[in-house]
Design a protein with these regions (language model features):
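Entry beta-strands of beta-propeller and related beta-repeat scaffolds
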Residues: 65-71, 113-117, 163-170, 224-231, ...
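Blade-level signature of beta-propeller repeat domains, shared across WD40, Kelch, NHL, RCC1
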Residues: 333, 337-406, 413-425
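Structural motif
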Residues: 77-84, 122-128, 175-189, 236-255, ...
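Short loop/turn segments immediately following beta-strands, especially the blade-tip
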Residues: 87-88, 127-136, 183-195, 256-263, ...
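Secretory targeting signatures
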Residues: 1-40, 389-426
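Repeated scaffold domains used in trafficking and secretory/extracellular systems
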Residues: 53-65, 99-112, 148-161, 207-225, ...
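Surface-exposed loop and turn segments in beta-propeller and other repeat-based domains
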Residues: 46-49, 94-98, 138-150, 192-213, ...
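A short helix->beta-strand "capping" segment at the edge of beta-propeller domains
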Residues: 34-57
Length: 426
């Protein structure tokens, strides 16, 4: 190919124009072809081949593309189980044995890959990842929190690790209101079921936040040492005399301070939106938090400052590069990807065909789980390593274009150089 181009370029000028015109046509055709492959690659719709295949997934926490803890609907009720890397399954809560996971409101994957859930008033259950257990089994530790300041249910939990110590912030149902409580500090021995009790021997449970603002807290996430993100909502009557059955609901995003003492967490700053709800608080590895809402989103910086965006969604997932992917409702043909404050709309080959009920990220893949209008179980997976790779159509065309462009430019430079040198020594 190089010798052919060189031959054209060494001919009279009209052949050079033919060569340049051909190259221009190649550029235009390449641009059209690249635009034609602009749909996001690595996307698959359909049923899943995981252990939850055919069952409705209500909540799921991934530790890799093949390992997760899932809350699913079965023929006897709602179960909670863990699937390991090897594909083995351990039932944590089995509805066929008179227990049920229906009251479980959250699952949080800790930094050590253990998963913590609430199992009753003042009670947490830590599901130890097999790699944290000497014999490689899935073991469970039950943590009974101090009830000297009252009984409470736990609706969400976030973790903050600083050096060798860890602290937790929890959303708690105090009976008459929703509150926030801290628990810590916890030593590094909490990883193993053999030493988790001793690691919490000196841990302190704080009192509950005085909720004079009337916020219904729902989610928490770690920001930096001493700072946390929290979200929830406020309700109020739209006009005097309006029905209490149809109040106005507005979303709330707040920055919370807690010093790992018995003192209650306090609200540092609070933002109230115009409408919708915050469905996800996405904790990022750079000590920032992305609050994704149905009518807008908020980025909470490490120092607690907030930046607000207009993009709404029904599900949000962060990948291993701290890119937050926002997904819309049924029929949505795009996803918006946020990274370092920049939004990038990405086209899907076809619209979402189901309502998302659970989502997560493994090692390289994003997973959305839900049911379609016919009640069929559906899963959407996105391989985040596919865009721009040589395996994707767009990546291949980009590679081919760069290759041909490089060959042409090298040949043209080579020929021009030879002519210049020849003219110099004549």
């Amino acid at each position: 190919m190089a010798s052919g181009w060189r031959g054209y370029l060494e001919e009279e000028s009209e052949y050079q124009w033919i060569a340049m015109t051909g190259f221009l046509i190649f550029i235009l055709l390449g641009a059209v072809a690249i635009q034609g492959t602009s749909n996001l690659p690595g996307v698959e719709f359909g049923s899943s081949d995981a252990s939850h295949a055919g069952t409705r997934v209500l909540d799921i926490e991934y530790t890799s593309d093949t390992a997760f803890t899932a809350k699913v609907v079965t023929g006897t009720g709602i179960d909670l189980y863990m699937q390991t890397e090897s594909g083995s399954v351990t039932r944590i809560i089995d509805s066929s044995s008179s227990s049920d996971a229906g009251e479980m409101q959250f699952m949080t994957t800790l930094d050590n890959d253990n998963v913590v859930v609430a199992s009753g008033e003042n009670t947490l259950m830590v599901i130890h990842d097999p790699k944290n257990v000497a014999n490689g089994e899935v073991l469970i530790s039950t943590i009974q929190l101090d009830n000297s300041t009252g009984d409470f249910e736990i609706a969400d939990l976030a973790e903050r690790t600083s050096g060798s110590s860890t602290s937790w912030l929890m959303v708690t149902n105090e009976g008459s209101s929703m509150g926030l409580r801290g628990f810590g500090s916890i030593s590094e021995g909490a990883t193993s079921p053999d030493t988790i009790a001793s690691s919490m021997a000196t841990s302190i449970l704080s009192t509950a936040t005085d909720n004079t603002a009337g916020v219904v807290w729902e989610h928490v996430a770690s920001l930096s040492d001493g700072l946390w993100g929290a979200s929830g909502y406020l309700t109020y009557a739209t006009t005097a005399g309006s029905s209490p059955a149809t109040p106005t609901i507005v979303p709330v995003v707040a920055v919370i301070e807690w010093d790992t003492s018995i003192n209650a967490p306090t609200i540092k700053t609070m933002y109230t939106g115009d409408g919708g709800t915050i469905h996800s608080l996405v904790q990022l590895s750079d000590s920032t938090v992305f609050a994704a809402g149905t009518q807008g989103s908020t980025y909470i910086h490490e120092d607690g400052e907030m930046t607000h965006f207009d993009d709404g969604s029904v599900a949000a997932v962060a990948d291993n590069q701290d890119r937050v992917w926002l997904f819309g409702d049924v029929g949505s043909k795009t996803t918006v990807r946020y990274h370092q404050g920049q939004a990038e709309p990405l086209s899907l080959a076809r619209g979402l065909t189901f309502e998302t009920e659970a989502s997560g990220f493994g090692t390289h893949q994003i997973f959305l789980h839900g049911t379609d209008e016919q009640g069929a179980i559906q899963t959407l997976t996105i391989d985040t390593s596919a865009p721009g790779s040589i395996e994707s159509g767009r990546g291949f065309l980009n590679f081919m274009f760069l290759g041909v462009f490089t060959i042409v430019m090298v040949v043209m430079a080579w020929t021009a150089g030879e002519r210049l040198l020849g003219a110099k020594f004549r």
